[in-house]
Amino acid sequence: MKILMTGHTSPIGTMLYEHFKYDIHGCSRSNGYDLTQLQDIEKIVERSLQYDHFLNLAHVGTAQTQLLHLIHRHWTANNKFGKIVSFGTLGTELPLKVLQSLKTPMEYFTQKQSLEALHRRLCIEKPFGPQPQSILIRIMNYGVKMGERSSEPTCDSMDVIRTVEHVLGDPCYVSSIDLRKI
């Protein structure tokens, strides 16, 4: 299994990159891919044909949504049927008042909502038969929290690894997973 991914230098990405290290190639600014530049996004899209699956983790503006759209379209045109796993957030489901208390820029949630909307369209575009599979993993509270949030349950690296292994290895089309501890 060969995997191409963006976001391999982020906390979740680093952990996934290390876990799959013999079968994965990361694309980031550190190795020549600037996800704010369309020509670099297009290079990733073209390169993705050489891999079995794509992990779409890097949140750089609208790059995640662009990559999902362009890779899905490119794979469809080339009869490639791998899995495109995008990472969202369950934060998009939280009430506005809670979101504002998190002090995360609202633009982040707007961009993740766009990613989710595109995923919902692509995952049912063709109900049956061979096709690229858009998979969305939405995570709530990854990593240890500090201060007033220190008592919140959080997902750890093994939770994410198990989930990614599940969606990549399962013969069924697992379209969406909401991952959180309660």
Q: What kind of region is each of these model predictions?
A:
Residues 149-182:
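C-terminal helical subdomain
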Residues 59-84:
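NAD(P)-cofactor binding segment of oxidoreductase domains
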Residues 76-127, 144-147:
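Catalytic loop of short-chain dehydrogenase/reductase
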